[in-house]
Amino acid sequence: MHDITLYGHMTVDRIFDGFEEKQTLGAMANMWRTFKHIAPDLDIGMCPTSIGEAIVYIDRDSSTRYSNFVPDIKTNTPIIKQSKISHAMYINKLLDVSWLKELTGVISADVCAGPRVDSSLLQHIDYFFIADEDAYADLKTMCKDTKGHVILHTNKSSVVSDGRYETNYKIDDSMFAPKSNVLGAGDMFASSFLYGLHLGLQIEEIQEYAHDTTSKLIRTEN
């Protein structure tokens, strides 16, 4: 049994950091890389269902990134693996989500910029990650759609709610890295959050750990 298994998109990223170009792997690879940084011995399963390509521009002055994403050059139906935590990436971009209800263990998912997520999928999700700019409704509505918790996050804060209770966390200004390469920051945050969940931490502790770890990783990679 794996500790955490990743499903969904893996991409070949062509990145322009200003005018400097490099190529790397993204999406699922971002989470894998984060796990290897924070917990090298964690047993990570990987089941890409879509392989695509992306062009990414990083604007350090505003700490933002812009991308054009062709997600489904190759697709495959995953073989579901036994796992303590199963995470589905970018479910608003997946062509086939029929396997989502078959995932094992604690089930989490996230979305990326693009079409609105099909809210009927969220009935299968224990932890749903969505960035503030991608929110399709208010937090209360998204919680009603989701089986478990919604993690609504920005680059400086997050709210975790199950519709009854919510916990809020905001990083200290000193932890924010200005003019930084924020590529993959959302994936770093989700990975760190899931690792905290794997450790059995309380939600408040997980939020603090996830934000702190993401900030440190961004500083390390810049």
Residue ranges and their predicted role:
Residues 1-46, 179:
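Glycine-rich phosphate/adenosyl-contacting loop at the front of the ribokinase-like
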Residues 24, 29, 41, 149, ...:
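Conserved post-catalytic alpha-helical subdomain immediately downstream of the catalytic base
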Residues 14-15, 158-161, 190, 218:
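Short active-site-adjacent structural elements
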Residues 13, 114, 135, 190-191:
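General alpha-helical segment detector with a strong preference for membrane-spanning helices
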Residues 2-6, 36, 43, 54-169, ...:
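Ribokinase/PfkB-type carbohydrate-kinase core domain
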